[in-house]
């Protein structure tokens, strides 16, 4: 049977940047629209893009600092106003941009007295500082400051042990996430079977990438995830007839099918870090010393457990609980 008329949509899917702002060197905003989409597709794309933007876009950070003749993070340095800990926290705030991979070396060589800012960092050619006004330290005496830095480009985050100091080398908890936040919304139009949707994406970055660049990278990463499905299905995936040189899955399929204990919520909470909760520095440092690095770590503690954390006062605990209630509608249980 041949249909007399076949209705074919010739509309082309298009995207457009409808708003772009730089509120500061370290806060950029972009709003994008994608249309026309069939009903339901906007939500599918929006969920995937938000996750890719927040978790898959690469960033550049200072990951290690070397200070001569310093043994502890909370040591005081003669002639420098800040403690080692304060200097490390200031270095962590520096936003970098790099077009190359691998470990890069940088340094600071300054003679006091004077203020030291990000502008004083001697960088390799492939690395750029977004905001050179970031304060690092204040030298109060006529001393020489020689600081060595290690810079890496990566994705996600790296959490170091707070006591892992050797030969004056101090690792820094690095958050390789240039996208500070991402949201999406959907607008529907039309009626009946002709309903179509417009997807709006909002992206905030720290200046290490523009929102447009972050959108490109997240899109490429999503495409890469689906490329394997475009090739022929691998044979013998059940582990039978495993001949030398065959392309087998690198794990037992039965293990994957049964190991599904983690819930979606737990997976999401693993990727929310406590430095994103905007807690006061004293509260943040107390939680970090207790090896609480993510929201999932924090939710393993009851109210009473939080009260037992060293240097975490009752007022600080209340601040943590208030953030959990307002931002996540979570009320930790009592023992």
Swiss-Prot record:
Single GO cellular component term: chloroplast
The organism's place on the tree of life at top rank: Eukaryota
InterPro entries per UniProt: DNA-dir_RNA_pol_insert (IPR011262), DNA-dir_RNA_pol_RpoA/D/Rpb3 (IPR011263), DNA-dir_RpoA (IPR011773), RBP11-like (IPR036603), RNAP_asu_C (IPR011260), RNApol_insert_sf (IPR036643)
Keywords (A to Z) from UniProt: Chloroplast, DNA-directed RNA polymerase, Nucleotidyltransferase, Plastid, Transcription, Transferase
Region of interest: Alpha N-terminal domain (alpha-NTD): 1-233
Region annotation Alpha C-terminal domain (alpha-CTD): where it falls in the sequence: 264-335
Catalytic reaction list: RNA(n) + a ribonucleoside 5'-triphosphate = RNA(n+1) + diphosphate
Enzyme Commission code(s) on record: 2.7.7.6
GO terms assigned for molecular function: DNA binding; DNA-directed RNA polymerase activity; protein dimerization activity
Localization annotation: Plastid, Chloroplast
Single biological process term from Gene Ontology: DNA-templated transcription
CDD domains found in the cross-reference section: RNAP_alpha_NTD
Primary site of residence: plastid
Oligomer status and interactors: In plastids the minimal PEP RNA polymerase catalytic core is composed of four subunits: alpha, beta, beta', and beta''. When a (nuclear-encoded) sigma factor is associated with the core the holoenzyme is formed, which can initiate transcription.
Protein's job: DNA-dependent RNA polymerase catalyzes the transcription of DNA into RNA using the four ribonucleoside triphosphates as substrates.
UniProt remark on domains: The N-terminal domain is essential for RNAP assembly and basal transcription, whereas the C-terminal domain is involved in interaction with transcriptional regulators and with upstream promoter elements.
Family: Belongs to the RNA polymerase alpha chain family.
Name the record gives this protein: DNA-directed RNA polymerase subunit alpha
Species in which this protein is naturally found: Pinus koraiensis (Korean pine)
Name of the gene this protein is made from: rpoA
């Amino acid at each position: 049977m041949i249909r007399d008329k076949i209705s074919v949509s010739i509309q082309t899917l298009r995207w457009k940047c409808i708003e772009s702002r730089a509120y500061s060197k370290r806060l950029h905003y972009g709003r994008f629209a994608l249309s026309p989409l069939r009903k339901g597709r906007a939500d599918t794309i929006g969920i995937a893009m938000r996750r890719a933007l927040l978790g898959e876009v690469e960033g550049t950070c200072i990951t290690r600092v070397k200070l001569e003749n310093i043994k502890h993070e909370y040591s005081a340095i003669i002639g420098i106003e800040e403690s080692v800990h304060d200097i490390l926290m200031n270095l962590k705030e520096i936003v970098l941009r790099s077009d190359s991979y691998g470990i890069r070396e940088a340094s600071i060589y300054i003679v006091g007295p004077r203020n030291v800012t990000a502008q004083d960092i001697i960088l390799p050619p492939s690395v750029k500082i977004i905001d050179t006004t970031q304060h690092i330290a204040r030298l109060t005496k006529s001393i020489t400051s020689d600081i060595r830095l290690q810079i890496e480009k990566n994705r996600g985050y790296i959490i170091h042990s707070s006591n892992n100091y050797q030969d004056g080398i101090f690792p820094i908890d690095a958050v390789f996430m240039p996208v500070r936040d991402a949201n999406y919304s959907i607008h529907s139009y039309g009626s009946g079977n002709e309903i179509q949707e417009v997807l709006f994406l909002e992206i905030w970055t720290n200046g290490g990438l523009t929102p447009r660049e972050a959108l490109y990278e997240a899109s490429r990463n999503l495409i890469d995830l689906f490329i394997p499905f475009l090739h022929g299905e691998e044979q013998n995936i059940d582990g039978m007839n495993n001949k030398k040189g065959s392309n087998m899955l690198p794990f037992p399929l039965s293990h994957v099918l049964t190991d599904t204990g983690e819930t979606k919520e737990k997976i999401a909470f693993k990727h929310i870090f406590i430095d994103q909760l905007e807690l006061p520095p004293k509260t943040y440092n107390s939680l970090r010393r207790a090896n609480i690095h993510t929201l999932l770590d924090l939710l393993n503690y009851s109210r009473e457990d939080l009260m037992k954390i060293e240097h975490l006062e009752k007022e600080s605990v209340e601040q943590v609980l208030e953030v959990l209630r307002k931002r996540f509608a979570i009320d930790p249980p009592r023992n």
